[in-house]
Each structure stands twice: as C-alpha cells, then as structure tokens.
Amino acid sequence: MTIAPTPDWNPRSDAVQQDQIAAYDHLRDQYGAAYSEMLHWSVLGHADVLRILQDHERFSNVVSRHVAVPNGMDPPEHTAYRALIEPYFTQERVEAFRPVCERITAELLQALQGRREVDWVAAFALPFAVRIQCAFMGWPMDLEAELTEWSARSHAATLAQDRPALDALAAQFEGIVARMLDERRASGADPQQDVTASLMHATVLGQPLGADAIASILRNWTVGEIGTISAAVGILAQWLAEHADLQATLRAEPARQPEAIDEILRLHGPLVTNRRVATCPVEVAGRQIPAGGRITLHWTSANRDPRVFEAPGEFRWGRNPQDNLLYGAGIHVCPGAALSRMELGVALRALLAAVASLAPTAQASEPAHYPAIGFARLPLQLRWA
C-alpha cells in the first residue's frame, strides 16, 4: 500500500485563490513539483512540463474514467482522433469564420456604447466566448444562458471536488448534446455547413463516431473554449487598462497586436492546468512519483519560469515564441490555436478601435477561482472613440 506524501500546499486555500499566479510562482521556486491532496503532483517548472508533454509513454493522458477525445488518449488512438479533428481548424476554416466573429464582437460593443463603466467579464468577455462557440458549432444563441450557468456550476463543483455534482453536470451536458443531435437528425442539417452535423457523419478507423465520442469532442469545444476565451479576453483588457502606453502602441501599430496577445497571456495564462498519470515510477524535480501517480501540469507557472524567461513578470517584446506554452506543446498541442488567435485578435482590434482609452475604476476586480483563472468581475472605465 502506497502512503500519500505530506501535502506541500492546499490549492483551495484563500491565499491561493486570491492570487493564483503568485501562489504558483512561489511553489515553482520553492519545490518545482509540489504535492497536494486535490491536485496530487503539481509540476511547475518549464523544463519539467515540457519533458512530460513530450513523453506519453511514461506520462499518459488516459487519466479519467470518462471518454475524453482526443486529450484523454495516447497514441495510436490519439493519432487517429487527432487526424479527425484537425481539419475543423484549418486556416481556411478559421478565415471563413472570421466575419461571424467580427459580427458578434461588433454587436456586443454596440450594446455597450455610451456606458462609461462596465463589468467587462459580464458585459463582454463571457458572452463573447459563449456566442462565438455556439456560432462555430452551429448551435442556437438561446443556449447562452444555459451554457453560462453550466460553466459556472462546473467550476464550483471542480473546486469543491463534488463528485455527485460533477456527474450530474456531465449528464446535463450530454442532454444538451443529445438535443443538438436530435435537431440535426430531424432537420437533415448539411454536414458541409454545420460542424455538429459533420461530426455525426465522421468516421475514425472506418467506424462512425459513437455518441460518447461526439459528446466528448463537443464538450471540449464548448466548455474548454468558453473558459479559456472568456478568461483571455478579460486578462487582455485588464492588462491594457493598467498599461496605457501599451494601449497606445497597439493602436498605432496594430500589426504588433498578435505578439502582444501571446506575451500578455504568457504573463497571466487563461488555462491553469492539464492532467497526466505516471505509467511507471519516475523522478520529477527531485520528487519520486510512483506508477499510477496523478500529475497536474501548471501552464501558468511554467510560462513564468525565470530559467526560461528573463524578468518573467515583465511584458517584453521579442521573446522566443517557441518557449511560450500558451497552446501547449508536443502531440497534444492545442488544435484550435489558430482559431483562438483569430478570435482574440478580432476582439482586441475591435476594442481598441471602439474606445479611446481603457482604464481601471475605483472598484476592485474579483479573481476567478480554480479551475478558472483571470477575473470573475472586472470593472473597467471606457472612453469611447
């Protein structure tokens, strides 16, 4: 019988949840790999995270009893499903979706016109993320409230480690997917024009996708993207509100916006962690992890490692983009990176064009709690152009 190590930290503590970035920086510098009852072995250094990402034989992605396509798979199964998914995120498809993203962005900003103070998360970041994902998958916009509530309840249940609630939420999402599939069967939706209908006709290794696989893919494309895109849009707005000089630079030189987005999101990542499991006894950052040991990779910490990024807490132009783990690395690198970059670029460019200045207000922001990051509430002052 394996005896669990004495915990090094508590991910649910108030101190961690009030400032996740500072907490993970401290853990990385003190431990490299730190144990907790909730997250088990948290790996925090850039080199260690990269090593694990590139070694699926010793660090498996098969971490859940639920189907997770393709992020919960290892080769060769992962390879087959990845080949199915990647065509949905080609540059051609991304550019075809750009006008839809621009329309949604314009509608949200138009609704805010004239308001001098807003909670940016509630007024823009969250509805933007939900609406663009619904549009991408061909889902109706009247799902916005249900998906927003579902996402919030899922985050709360994850932090509380409430297994019955998580199971109920999984069943609820499967119900949403079932409704979407039934609607397409009834209407004869064109798989060439509708992403969800296309998945219903897809095959892997000569076999049609099962209902569990379709639900898993759609869950990744909704839950994952809603959380990370809304967090990213909030983080970008907060950083620019605090740095008027960078605002001015990006208005004057819009071609620099893509690099700025990636650097801001290196400083304050929109995704906190991913999971792995050790398939054999391994040593990571001087800690002994047994076979079957649960591992949590901390993107936010790895991307602020001073051994890779000089002055890691500073915004700097010209950093090596290959070092930035914003979209992961290795065989599980985010297949939707081009889509996410387009969406964030559209949102930022439109915001900077619509407002002459973006600034903090006297009200304090509220941090989002794990597994989310960024802001639960972000009061901003807008001066319209």
For each feature predicted by the language model, list its residue ranges:
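Cytochrome P450
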Residues: 1-385
